[in-house]
Amino acid sequence: MKLTWIKCMRKTEKMNDIDEPRLFEETGIEAFVAALVIPLLKPLDFRLVRVKLLGQNGLTLQIMVERADGSMTIEDCETVSRTVSHLLDVQNVIERKYHLEISSPGIDRPLVRKSDFFHWQGHIAKIETKITIDGRKKFRGILANITQEGLTLNTDKAAYGEAMYIAIPFDNIIDAHLVLTDELIRNALKKNKDLSQQFISEDNPNVSKQLSNYKN
């Protein structure tokens, strides 16, 4: 790997316990990578959000992380990159040439833990379920009535005949993420005044920094 692509938000929103389990996990190669990196992240006070293998613009292995105490600096992203990249090379997880991308969750973040849903209650999210509810598996709406068992999604764009309120248990969710809206951006920018992106060349210790807005 010649290039590591790092996307990082400064001062990310405060999260809860680093040991809080995720609601859903990866499969295949992504699950293997997750199993490798989680033990490396925890002693450094990081926790895994997700692992995703992307095919756009070549092969990219995205490892999305966050700190449990709510902070996530560019230096933190660099630390994670240095910590996991050597092990991934030694394990030869992906035989093809690929880019390693270390990323913080971003504004329209995935919702992978119960605390994520509690924290972002009142914002719009897209949710996909394992089992159909009212003949559907994909939903969009405002997160509401969050409990330890599940949530209510107040659909903001319900078609004629569709229910306005959908009760979704956590154990039926396979994917969920926030929808980028003006309100979400305003809320996030109050917590994250500086969104940063940067490339780190493994052959060059110098880091070039470029500030820009980041969308997953």
Swiss-Prot record:
SUPFAM superfamilies assigned: YhbC-like, C-terminal domain, YhbC-like, N-terminal domain
Stored InterPro entries: Ribosome_maturation_RimP (IPR003728), RimP_C (IPR028998), RimP_C_sf (IPR036847), RimP_N (IPR028989), RimP_N_sf (IPR035956)
Top-level taxon in the UniProt lineage: Bacteria
Database matches in CDD domains: YlxS_C (cd01734)
Keywords: Cytoplasm, Ribosome biogenesis
Cellular-component GO terms for this entry: cytosol
Gene3D superfamilies xref list: Ribosome maturation factor RimP, C-terminal domain, RimP-like superfamily, N-terminal
Keyword Amino-acid biosynthesis (UniProt): no
GO BP annotations listed: ribosomal small subunit assembly; translation
Compartments, as annotated in UniProt: Cytoplasm
Cited Pfam families: DUF150_C, RimP_N
Coiled-coil features, chain-numbered ranges: none
Membership in a protein family: Belongs to the RimP family.
HAMAP family: RimP (MF_01077)
Known role: Required for maturation of 30S ribosomal subunits.
The protein's name in its UniProt record: Ribosome maturation factor RimP
Lineage: Bacteria, Pseudomonadati, Pseudomonadota, Alphaproteobacteria, Hyphomicrobiales
